[in-house]
Amino acid sequence: DLWQWGQMILKETGKLPFSYYTAYGCYCGWGGRGGKPKADTDRCCFVHDC
């Protein structure tokens, strides 16, 4: 779930997941902006969204 994802990101990267990934790439965050995923993390968001 979203809470577990956030905890994993914080533990592994030390970054606050919601402020860092809310607008990351083309697909992370609320809705997708379309286009080709920019990186592996963005690709993961793409797979989750689609």
From Swiss-Prot:
Name this polypeptide is given: Basic phospholipase A2 Bmaj-9
How does the cofactor bind to this protein, according to its record? Binds 1 Ca(2+) ion.
What positions does the entry give for Ca(2+) binding?
A: Y27, G29, G31, D49
Miscellaneous comment:
Negative results: does not show myotoxicity.
Source taxonomy: Eukaryota, Metazoa, Chordata, Craniata, Vertebrata
Q: Which family does the UniProt entry place this protein in?
A: Belongs to the phospholipase A2 family. Group II subfamily. D49 sub-subfamily.
Active site as annotated: H48
**Gene Ontology BP terms:** arachidonate secretion; negative regulation of T cell proliferation; phospholipid catabolic process; venom-mediated perturbation of transmission of nerve impulse in another organism
The compartments listed are: Secreted
- Tell me the tissue specificity: Expressed by the venom gland.
Reactions mediated catalytically: a 1,2-diacyl-sn-glycero-3-phosphocholine + H2O = a 1-acyl-sn-glycero-3-phosphocholine + a fatty acid + H(+)
